[in-house]
Amino acid sequence: MGKSRILIIGATGYIGRQVAKASAALGHPTLILVRETTASNPEKAQLLESFKSSGITIVHGSLEDHASLVEAIKKVDVVISTVGGAQIADQLNIIKAIKEVGTIKRFLPTEFGNDVDKTSAVEPAKGLFALKVKIRRAIEAEGIPYTYVSSNCFAGYFLPNLGQPGLTAPPRDKIVIFGDGNAKAVFVKEEDIGTFTIKSVDDPRTLNKTLYLRLPANTFSFNELVALWEKKIGKTLEKVYVPEEQVLKTIAETPFPGNIIISIAHSIFVKGDQTNFEIGDNGVEGSELYPDVKYTTVDEYLNQFV
């Protein structure tokens, strides 16, 4: 059996570009759906050129244009959505088109974070996660084969400044820690998320399951992360612990979109939502399924900042 033909919707976005690159690199015939106007953005135009040179086919269309969706989906076996937060609900249009085409072997909706079915997040993250839950239930109700990729933290969002807003490098004097710093989280380099995602599309073990990236070398509590950084720079940082009550107050007082970021951080670093449950029968873990993937460890990632 040849490798599945893959359509990626949202391929010019932050995680979408990594998924698209991995798809081409792993030898899948890859199509991306982009609006005709995308090429008028210079940064996106350059990205589209690099996609073309790696053999990716560009098709024009959008989530609002049903005919374009159907036309693109007819050409492939697998659909991956990596659309951003503002378009989560619009994935109902993808579901409708997949249903109409009727030949899709797998749909991966936009996930790439915490498992939204296992969360104790507060608003506004709670509402954002609820939209993803709604999409999951719609996929299941239509009987569309799926894989949900729960890849946890993007390394690039968090590790370059150890979660300290406004800093461009990890701190060398003082660090603010939410909660007691003991909840464990998982930090995965974006390129590796792309690789694990594409590895899963033709794998019967991930069919109608959640693929968790709970990579052993990348699972750290905040305290462990700080200790690793201190060891690298040979210096002890002053640690400021923010109790949960204060974190909740900050969320309530912070305007959008800052409150979303803090409420997601609360879910991860105070509640431990990435690791506070066992992976059950409806889940599989990426590094166990694909031991051949040499992912970048947190230890290696931090070396660039020393």
UniProtKB/Swiss-Prot annotation:
Principal EC category: oxidoreductase
Binding site for NADP(+): 10-16, 35, 44, 136
Active site: 132
Catalysed reactions listed for this entry: (-)-dehydrodiconiferyl alcohol + NADPH + H(+) = (S)-isodihydrodehydrodiconiferyl alcohol + NADP(+); (+)-dehydrodiconiferyl alcohol + NADPH + H(+) = (R)-isodihydrodehydrodiconiferyl alcohol + NADP(+); (2R,3S)-dihydrodehydrodiconiferyl alcohol + NADPH + H(+) = (S)-tetrahydrodehydrodiconiferyl alcohol + NADP(+); (2S,3R)-dihydrodehydrodiconiferyl alcohol + NADPH + H(+) = (R)-tetrahydrodehydrodiconiferyl alcohol + NADP(+)
Keyword Endoplasmic reticulum among record annotations: no
Keyword Oxidoreductase appears in the UniProt entry: yes
GO molecular function: oxidoreductase activity, acting on NAD(P)H, oxygen as acceptor
GO annotation (BP), single: lignan biosynthetic process
Function in brief: Oxidoreductase involved in lignan biosynthesis. Catalyzes the NADPH-dependent reduction of phenylcoumaran benzylic ethers. Converts dehydrodiconiferyl alcohol (DDC) to isodihydrodehydrodiconiferyl alcohol (IDDDC), and dihydrodehydrodiconiferyl alcohol (DDDC) to tetrahydrodehydrodiconiferyl alcohol (TDDC). May regulate changes in lignin content and accumulation of flavonoids.
Protein's UniProt name: Phenylcoumaran benzylic ether reductase IRL1
Species: Ginkgo biloba (Ginkgo)
